[in-house]
């Protein structure tokens, strides 16, 4: 086993114990998980190289410190073990299991189950669907917006969520975004033959929004919306940003959202979600001229 392979195995163990890679990033003081996703990709790419340096000492010390591991833990081989589901549940926030399965070979359809002490979610999507949706989340206005993604993206979306709505809608909105992002990433597979980029302008009366997507494997959200009020019905508009952060970080897409005008908050939100659906439809579509090629001079969009 190379040094890099050893570091990778131990790094993945830390992520599993934390509940997920984004939660490990938060534990270690990162604002977003992008740096740790890039570290994972580099370790995977260099795993078989005996001369690769693995994780640099300063980052190794940071990971060990924030996860309560002794100094040098990442440099040592440990007996493989699985985090018990009951132990994960006892933390109150840990992600207990993520199950992702394609329904058939070559079919861009997937079901993801994500269960925590805050939410229990099942998301099924078909990127080559007809725009149907079946939504049971307990948050009516969020369902109305996700229905726009399905209808305008021509993506079939089925979401069932039982969340801690007695507290508020925050965990439900964020975790649905996370799980939907995981489903998009899994359904896309190696991304060969897709257009990769998508964009859309959508108006609704006085409101106009622009959404641009790059399915690059590089998560990043630029979010420019100044809603004219803080609540639409009883839904807190701040949660839209949490929803899109979840999608971005777990689908590994770059997403720019700009509401260019609008006075009615409902119209502002609806133009954003319709534009997102249409931009996503464009980005995930197969380009017949690509003939199964990866739309990148790098040769991959998953490493």
Swiss-Prot record:
It is found in: Cytoplasm. It catalyses: D-erythro-1-(imidazol-4-yl)glycerol 3-phosphate = 3-(imidazol-4-yl)-2-oxopropyl phosphate + H2O. One of its GO terms (molecular function) is imidazoleglycerol-phosphate dehydratase activity. Pathway: Amino-acid biosynthesis; L-histidine biosynthesis; L-histidine from 5-phospho-alpha-D-ribose 1-diphosphate: step 6/9. GO terms for biological process: L-histidine biosynthetic process. Its main location: cytoplasm. It comes from the Bacteria. InterPro entries: IGPD_sf (IPR038494), ImidazoleglycerolP_deHydtase (IPR000807), ImidazoleglycerP_deHydtase_CS (IPR020565), Ribosomal_Su5_D2-typ_SF (IPR020568). One of its GO terms (cellular component) is cytoplasm. The keyword Transferase does not apply. Keywords: Amino-acid biosynthesis, Cytoplasm, Histidine biosynthesis, Lyase. Its EC number is 4.2.1.19. HAMAP family: HisB. Belongs to the imidazoleglycerol-phosphate dehydratase family. This is Imidazoleglycerol-phosphate dehydratase.
């Amino acid at each position: 086993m190379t040094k890099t392979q050893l570091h990778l195995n131990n790094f993945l163990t830390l992520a599993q114990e934390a509940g997920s890679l984004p939660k490990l990033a938060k534990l270690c003081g990162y604002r977003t998980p992008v740096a740790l996703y890039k570290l994972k990709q580099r370790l995977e790419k260099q795993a078989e190289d005996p001369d690769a340096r693995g994780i640099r000492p300063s980052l190794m010390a940071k990971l060990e410190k924030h996860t309560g591991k002794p100094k040098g833990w990442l440099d040592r081989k440990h007996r493989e073990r699985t985090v018990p589901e009951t132990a994960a549940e006892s933390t109150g926030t840990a992600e207990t299991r993520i199950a992702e399965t394609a329904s058939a070979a070559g079919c861009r359809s997937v079901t993801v189950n994500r269960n925590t002490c805050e939410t229990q979610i099942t998301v099924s999507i078909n990127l080559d669907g007809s725009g149907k949706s079946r939504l049971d989340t307990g948050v009516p206005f969020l369902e109305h917006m996700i229905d726009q993604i399905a209808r305008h993206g021509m993506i079939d979306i089925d979401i069932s969520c039982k969340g801690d709505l007695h507290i508020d809608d925050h965990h439900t909105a964020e975790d649905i975004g996370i799980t939907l992002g995981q489903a998009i990433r899994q359904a896309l597979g190696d991304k060969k033959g897709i257009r990769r980029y998508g964009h859309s302008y959508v108006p609704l009366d006085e409101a106009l929004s622009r959404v641009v997507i790059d399915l690059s494997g590089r998560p990043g959200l630029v979010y420019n919306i100044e809603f004219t009020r803080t609540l639409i019905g009883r839904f807190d508009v701040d949660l839209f940003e949490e929803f899109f952060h979840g999608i971005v970080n777990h689908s590994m897409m770059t997403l720019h959202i700009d509401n260019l005008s609008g006075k009615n908050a409902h119209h502002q939100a609806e133009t954003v979600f319709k534009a997102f659906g249409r931009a996503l439809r464009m980005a995930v579509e197969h380009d017949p001229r690509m003939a199964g090629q990866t739309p990148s001079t790098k040769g991959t969009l998953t490493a």
